[in-house]
């Protein structure tokens, strides 16, 4: 009689135990027996040795299977060997040999560190560049001749959003025809080339390539209320830099880096290390903030007739190009030396879809819709507060040097605050789980946003108190708005971004790739552009940004409420997908090992590899 049991060990009763021990070492795994140059003389894990039981809990009568006294007295050796299905592990290297554990450093396996350290360095380089680009783009477009802060809402709505949609469509097409490696290099290399060309070619030639005369004629014809749209034409190369800097944040950070991180990490590793990725990233914020501050002071100390922006841009763009090349090198190293984790093979393979089919599929998915709600809600909420704050900042620091220096300090403070939040985030994930972590960011943004709007609305009564602190109401609003942005962005980097990226991991590859492209490249600018559209509508309706402040506060409350509802819905779907994935993996591990239970021969010992056709004289089954 022969049966098959779904288990992880091979239970065999050798016919000739003494002879078999010299030929077949059960303690050796299949891999060792096939490939080892010299078989090691290791004893297997024996349940009995020369008739004496090693494990007192082992009983000869199990679940109705009767074994005679003669059979019990027969001397035999029963050894259990791990089949090592799937993972290649060897169970039981004998009494004197312990199971070899993976080497660890500070309690973390070396194989895991080979992923985490390069990913942390990549995140450092990416956010170092992003901080420099983010601080520089505002100064370029706001302080340029013939431009002002009014250009920003128009840029986000009518330039940045169409560019983001166009990139998403192109990225979706490329993802169907290129490998992951080729797609990564195809996307990031044009960014590196452009930023180098801007610092060394486009900016020095800006006086020749900007249509100043045409812009002046249009401004005279259309009137000053169209100064924002006309400024886009007037300083088109600066606006292109602004858009490319915005796309660096949404494309390189969200799509390329997090997509790569999701590809090579498991959910358990993500829960433990995703919040810590930001530690290196926020050290980058601190250093890049100091870099911007240094070049701001350098421009201030240059002699007359020297274009400070030209000098500083060449230096900063050189740093950006160097960091970009370092990102490519780290990506190559990880792909070369770090193995990919095994994923569940039972997931449905999605067919290749066109652009419209992809969009329809993503819109029809409640999971993707909730993710999109999170991203759009954050973009609108932070934009409603941030643009108002930047208008106050422009009024307080009209000089480019002062504006840039303040932004450098702001980035440094953001890095310090986020670094602290990163240290606390792992505790939040371990103690309270994904759902609570996802709800902290909207709560922080709501509370700090209310404080900022309240100071603007009721700044008059607070003027005497603010004067005692040596500040004007305008400067106080600038500082409170800065604190609001610092707390909101630190919560975003330490909790919101890891939560969002962890939500992609249980998805199948097709939904993961195209969903990230649609959400991160389109929904992120859509949130910013949506906030800009709301502000433009309010300004046109109520005459000024100050008059529309109470209504902006009410809109902020509604959006954050929808954000919290989407986070709650996504929490349930995420936990359900995780449970399904774990169940599939367990089933794969169980089904990959089939263990034959062999019969006994006349000597009372089992025979290994007996076929069903064996004669009954040679095989006497036990009594059931």
From Swiss-Prot:
Residues 1-79 form a transit peptide. InterPro entries: ADP_ATP_car_bac_type (IPR004667). It comes from the Eukaryota. Keywords: Acetylation, ATP-binding, Chloroplast, Membrane, Nucleotide-binding, Plastid, Transit peptide, Transmembrane, Transmembrane helix, Transport. It holds the Pfam family TLC. Its main location: plastid. Residues 579-624 are annotated as: Disordered. It is found in: Plastid, Chloroplast membrane. It is a multi-pass membrane protein. The keyword Ubl conjugation does not apply. The chain crosses the membrane at residues 108-128, 182-202, 240-260, 315-335, 446-466, 545-565. The modification N-acetylalanine is found at residue 80. The keyword ATP-binding applies. GO terms for cellular component: chloroplast envelope; chloroplast membrane; mitochondrion; plastid. GO terms for molecular function: ATP binding; ATP:ADP antiporter activity. Residues 602-624 have a biased composition (Low complexity). May function as an ATP importer. Belongs to the ADP/ATP translocase tlc (TC 2.A.12.2) family. This is ADP,ATP carrier protein 1, chloroplastic.
């Amino acid at each position: 009689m022969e049966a098959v049991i779904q288990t992880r060990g091979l239970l065999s009763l050798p016919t000739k135990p003494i002879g078999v021990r010299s030929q077949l070492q059960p303690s050796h795994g299949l891999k060792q027996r096939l490939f080892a140059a010299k078989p090691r003389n290791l004893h297997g894990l024996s349940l009995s040795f020369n008739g004496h039981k090693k494990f007192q809990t082992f009983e000869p009568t199990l679940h109705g299977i009767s074994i005679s006294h003669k059979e019990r007295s027969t001397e035999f050796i029963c050894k259990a060997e791990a089949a090592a299905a799937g993972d290649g592990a060897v169970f039981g290297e004998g009494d004197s040999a312990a199971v070899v554990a993976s080497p660890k450093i500070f309690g973390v396996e070396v194989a895991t560190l080979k992923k985490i350290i390069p990913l942390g360095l990549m995140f450092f380089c990416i956010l170092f560049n992003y901080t420099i680009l983010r601080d520089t783009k505002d100064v370029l477009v706001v302080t340029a001749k013939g431009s002002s802060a009014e250009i920003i809402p128009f840029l986000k709505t009518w330039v940045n959003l169409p560019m983001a949609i166009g990139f998403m469509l192109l990225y979706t097409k490329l993802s169907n025809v290129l490998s992951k490696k080729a797609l990564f290099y195809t996307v990031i290399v044009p960014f590196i080339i452009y930023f180098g060309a801007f610092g060394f070619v486009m900016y020095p030639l800006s006086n020749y390539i900007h249509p100043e005369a045409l812009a002046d004629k249009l401004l005279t014809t259309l009137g000053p209320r169209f100064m924002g749209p006309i400024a886009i034409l007037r300083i088109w190369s600066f606006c292109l830099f602004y858009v490319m800097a915005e796309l660096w944040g949404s494309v390189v950070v969200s799509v390329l880096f997090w997509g790569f991180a999701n590809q090579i990490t498991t959910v358990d590793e993500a829960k433990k290390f995703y919040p810590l990725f930001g530690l290196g990233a926020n050290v980058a914020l601190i250093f890049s903030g100091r870099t911007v501050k240094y070049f701001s002071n350098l421009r201030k100390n240059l002699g007359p007739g020297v274009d400070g922006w030209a000098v500083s841009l060449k230096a900063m763009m050189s740093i950006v190009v160097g960091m970009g090349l370092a990102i490519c090198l780290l990506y190559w190293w990880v792909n070369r030396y770090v193995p990919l984790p095994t994923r569940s093979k039972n997931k449905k393979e999605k067919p290749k879809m066109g652009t419209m089919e992809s969009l329809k599929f993503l819109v029809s998915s409640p999971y993707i819709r909730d993710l999109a709600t999170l991203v759009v809600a954050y973009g609108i909420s932070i934009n409603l507060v941030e643009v108002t704050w930047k208008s106050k900042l422009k009024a307080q620091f009209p000089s480019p040097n002062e504006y840039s220096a303040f932004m450098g300090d702001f980035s440094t403070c953001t890095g310090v605050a986020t670094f602290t939040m990163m240290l606390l985030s792992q505790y939040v994930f371990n103690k309270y789980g994904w759902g609570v972590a996802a709800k902290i960011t909207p709560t922080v943004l709501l509370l700090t946003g209310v404080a900022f709007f309240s100071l603007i609305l009721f700044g008059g009564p607070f003027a005497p108190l603010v004067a005692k602190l040596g500040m004007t109401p305008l400067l106080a609003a600038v500082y409170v708005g800065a604190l609001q942005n610092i707390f909101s962005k630190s919560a975003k980097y330490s909790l919101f971004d890891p939560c969002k990226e962890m939500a992609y991991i249980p998805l199948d590859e097709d939904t993961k790739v195209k969903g990230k492209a649609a959400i991160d490249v389109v929904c992120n600018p859509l949130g910013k552009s949506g906030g800009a559209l709301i502000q433009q509508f309010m300004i046109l309706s109520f005459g000024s940004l100050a008059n529309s402040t109470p209504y902006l506060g009410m809109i902020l409350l509604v959006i954050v409420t929808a954000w919290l509802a989407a986070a709650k819905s996504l929490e349930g779907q995420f936990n359900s997908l995780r449970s399904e994935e774990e169940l599939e993996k367990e089933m794969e591990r169980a089904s990959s090992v089939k263990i034959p239970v062999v019969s006994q021969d006349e000597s009372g010992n089992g025979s290994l590899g007996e076929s069903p056709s064996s004669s009954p004289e040679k095989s006497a089954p036990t009594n059931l």
